[in-house]
Amino acid sequence: MGVLTDNELLLGGIVGGKRVLQSRVLPLSANELSGLLEFLWQQGVTSVWVLPSSQFSQRATCSWLQQASDQWTPLVHPSPAQPELPTSALFLSRGHEHRLTLAFPAYAGWRWILPDAISLLATATYLDQVLTRHMVESPQQSAHQLLTELTLKEPVSQLRVSPVDLWTLPDREGRPVPLQAETSGPSWMRPLTLEEQRQRYLHKYTYFSRALRACQDVQLGAGTPQLSPQGRAFDGIRPGIWHVHLDRAGSIFNDKQLPGSLNQEWISTPHVVCCRNIGYEVQIQEGYYWPQSHQLLKSWATFLWQAVEQMQNQSHQFRHGQARTNASQTLKQLAEHGIALLREPANAGGWSRPDWWAQIAGRQWALLFADLALLVRRGTMPVLVDGDAFWVVSADPNPFTAVRGLLSTQRWNGFAPGYEVPLFLSKKVQDLFRGKEPVGRVVSTLDNLAEEHTPL
């Protein structure tokens, strides 16, 4: 594996159990595509990542790469967002004895920060190591490939096919059941209390991916969904989608003290169980359930979770901080796009299982509320929750000790500080919690302020 810059080919290897770098100066002939391919073949590399800031990356187009010399047959993969630009190009020698892949992260859609060639080489190396495969395509294509590969041992085609059209599944009155009405988590904030206003710092914490965590144990439906007109078939185990009436009944998950889940009418089995666990009164009015269930996504989700866990727990083997961040972000993207495939229609390349997506979303709610309940028992009340992130105020400037028990474990538990340096609880910050700005805008403002105050 190597990284191509304007002047050199940077190669990574292992000598005596240690990673070493080697540099090869590009010849003048490398200014032409045919000369570059010949040079790379002579170096014995089979995959090369092109540094986004290089002139070669900036002038590369799909049509230009198609004009390789007579010695090579190019297979160019275009970017889904910009079809004229390449995500990768596979070059086969005329006799097919040699294969060479050029990858263009500038156009693939990975959210990588790459200040230099070493950060790109380390990022690609870490991903190869934890995924045991090359990921040179776009996030969508790579996620589809990985999800397919890691579920091969299961009867995927049999489990994926629904005997009925899930998009038109009728309720008692003949209206389509809104399988995609289930949301994956709240965006919520509350005003600061007087005591909180006297604190000095605002900390942000993120969780890697509750959606991926949910996929490790969620039950997914198989077979023909069965109508339960009065909801009496609900048992808290079988996958289902249920029309409910929720009452907070004194629960602190009331959208005032903590985020709530009171405004949803159709929710999945894991979400119903979650609502009862946090003290809601739940009246099930009707619903559908699946008589058979399985955990098709468990092996895929566990593989991705263990990949990021390996990097976090063995940081001495993954020493490049930015590359480790890039690789972790890549694993999260693979999870996001893989889960999104479940509810995409088949004619759009998806699995057409919105019911599976609903079960995962409901399980996400359960995991979030369990985490929030644990924080409260330990004496911490979040002031803002958005997806997998939450914010707290504290007199402690250290993010590793500001929330008791959250980051004290020696092994990675999914949580990480969202801000390297906490925000000072200034009047400007406090005013954000007094105003009427949407939560999303408040989050963006806070993140921008934190970025401005992060040391270089």
Residues of each region from the PLM?
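Conserved acidic
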Residues: 2-456
